[in-house]
Amino acid sequence: MDDNSPERVALITGCGKHLGIGPAIARALGGDGKAVVVADVAPAGAPNLNQQPGDMAAGWGGLPGVVDELTAAGVRCAAVLGDVSREDDARAMVDFAVKTFGRLDILVNNAAAPQAREFNDIEDVPLDAWQHVLDVNLTGTFLMCRAAVGPMRAQGWGRIINISSIAGRTGSARQGAYTASKHGVIGFTRSLSRDVARDGITVNAICPGGTYTSRVFSSARRSSGDIEAELQRRADAIPVGRLGTAEDVANAALYFASESSGYVTGQAQSVDGGVYQG
């Protein structure tokens, strides 16, 4: 960071999960000198998604644990609870960041809801299940951005990073709601980037591919009795020969959040080991 630059403040949603992308981004930004506000709908993430990879989750402290870890590393850090799909909560999370640290420079919209496995076939998808995925993944991104743009405009500087998915760049069978929501995140990112381009605010999306997180581990466990073999099968389908890590995604976020990324906006960057090359 330039010696004349203020301390940048980042708000990152979806930070309650073990092996999650959110905590990895918080570590990366905190390690780069940013103050960090970590957020989630509950201290350990959304209860219906809280399927951790066995013993690896032992001792996981959720949001409080992330704060303790970053604070011990010398990072100014705080946590806030809120549901991104609720208008009042979105505004309150942004207000909390501004009141706690005096400003908000970086917003990372990482909170997401998967499509429930039992609703894979379109004839079986209830409207409320479809709506929930769109409410969190797309409407939540909109609400958080809408709340954050005001403080960023007032400062004349901002970085918005929306976590989409490789599913937002192609089609995923039996994942209509999730795929539609992640395509929507990319479209919204591109539109918003034009709206705020003259305000010193950049807006970009990151599209992770197969990434070793607790959610992917749980998916592999459901798909096969041999979890390691299933994870290896998925890795073998990736050109670089391995699953991504949360840190791979965090490295991309670190660039988009940086001072040097000011001429890059409206982009959707795949972090997928070379799977999508469009």
Label every model-predicted segment:
Residues 165:
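Residue(s) in the substrate-gating loop at a strand-loop-helix junction
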Residues 114, 119, 170, 242, ...:
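Short C-terminal tail/terminal secondary-structure segment
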Residues 145, 181, 189:
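Active-site helix of classical SDR
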Residues 2-39, 43-44:
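Canonical Rossmann dinucleotide-binding motif of NAD(H)/NADP(H)-dependent dehydrogenases/reductases
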Residues 197, 202, 239, 264-266:
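Short, small/polar-rich loop/turn modules that mediate ligand/substrate recognition or access, typified
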Residues 118-122, 126-134, 234:
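Substrate-binding pocket helix/loop in short-chain dehydrogenase/reductase
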